Each structure stands twice: as structure tokens, then as C-alpha cells.
A protein has these predicted regions:
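Cysteine protease catalytic core and zymogen-processing segment of caspase-like enzymes
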Residues: 1-12
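Phosphate-binding and adjacent anionic-ligand microenvironments
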Residues: 15-207
Length: 207
């Protein structure tokens, strides 16, 4: 998926091309990037959802890569805007240099980070007059665990991101353009994906 591609692109720049500099990612993207940041000793900056937040942060920090959950990526020494053609060329170059097909590249990435990542998202409609009630419900929720994982912290940069043990997370946020609430999660355990999402819907009162 697009989050794993983001991880591969960051790995390509840091490991293969020897770049050294910050990574910028939206709050809804993979924690694989945080692990790569720790491994290569580079800062990882997290922004709200949308390239309108990513691009300025890239310029401010001179980041080597910036990206968002929808699969848009931008790169240092290039325009601070999504460029799918360049991203595709970088993936092809990574395949060429390591002589690996995409599935093998992921194995290499997961071997480097020490873990796999499994991601999914659920979109749910709601009556527009219920938005404030949903926000209050999520804001006041105080779960000790989600999906059987201990809650570590809550980030309200854009919506409500519940950071869980092991780098797993659940994000609940509203669409900026339509009456839809989006529930995202990433976990190292594929069997926990649907449970985490269901708990997220329950927290929002939408299950």
C-alpha cells in the first residue's frame, strides 16, 4: 500500500543514496518512518493531513522527503509538491540497485525496521448536526487500551490520534469537505487491524 511505498522511498534515500535529513509526514502516515528516523538518526516531523501542511514544513526543515497517506510524495532538490513520476522512478531505481522485486524490497525494509506494518481505514457518514457531539465523545474518551493494546498518548494535531504500545496507532478525524468521519489504524499485528478500527468506531459512537 501507499504507506509501505513511503517507507521504501525513505529507505531508498537514506540507505541507498546516503541522504541525511528530516522526513516530513502527515499524522495519518506510517510509523515505519519514525523507526527509520531512529535508525538513521534523522528527525521526523508530523503535520496535519494535506500537502498544504507538508510542503511548508519540508521547506522550513529542508527535508529529504515529505508525504501523505493518500500516496503523494515530494523530494528534496525538487518542487515541494507531489510528484508521482519521480516517486515511481525512485522505486524503479531501488529495484535496479538492490536487484529485488517489490515484495523482496518490503522484506528488506521490514528486516531493517524490525517489524511489518498493516494499515486500513474506514469511512463512516454521520448526521452533520452530530459533529460536535462526536467531537466531545472522542475528546472525553479515556480508554486504557484499544484493540487490546495499551494507550500511550493522544495527539490532537489533526483529529484524535491514539498512540498505542509498539508504535501502533488509531486516528479519528473528520473529512474537511463532507460529513464523513475517517477512522485509520496501523499495527504490526495483521490480526488486530479490524479490532482496532471497530474500537475506533465505538469511541466515536458509530459502531
Amino acid at each position: 500500500n501507499q504507506l509501505r511505498v513511503f517507507g521504501l522511498l525513505a529507505f531508498y534515500l537514506l540507505e541507498v543514496r546516503g541522504a541525511h535529513g528530516p522526513i516530513v509526514k502527515t499524522i495519518s502516515t506510517t510509523s515505519l518512518l519514525n523507526k527509520l528516523g531512529q535508525i538513521y538518526d534523522v528527525p521526523v516531523y508530523e503535520t496535519g493531513v494535506g500537502f498544504k501542511f507538508v510542503a511548508p514544513k519540508m521547506t522550513e526543515t529542508n527535508a529529504i522527503i515529505g508525504g501523505e497517506e493518500s500516496g503523494g510524495f515530494a523530494f528534496q532538490h525538487h518542487v515541494p509538491e507531489r510528484d508521482g513520476i519521480l516517486a515511481g522512478l525512485y522505486i524503479l531505481d531501488l529495484m535496479r540497485l538492490l536487484d529485488q522485486k517489490p515484495s523482496q524490497l518490503l522484506e528488506t525494509l521490514f528486516s531493517k525496521t524490525g517489524t511489518e506494518s498493516h494499515y486500513d481505514r474506514v469511512d463512516s457518514t454521520f448526521p452533520s448536526d452530530q459533529k460536535e457531539k462526536i467531537i466531545d465523545r472522542v475528546h472525553n474518551a479515556n480508554p486504557s487500551e484499544i484493540g487490546g493494546l495499551t494507550l500511550i498518548s493522544v495527539d490532537t494535531t489533526d483529529g484524535f490520534k491514539f498512540n498505542l504500545e509498539g508504535g501502533d496507532w488509531l486516528l479519528i478525524r473528520f473529512s474537511g469537505t463532507e460529513p464523513i468521519i475517517r477512522v485509520y489504524c496501523e499495527t504490526t499485528d495483521a490480526d488486530k487491524v479490524q479490532k482496532i478500527l471497530q474500537d475506533g468506531l465505538s469511541i466515536a459512537g458509530l459502531s
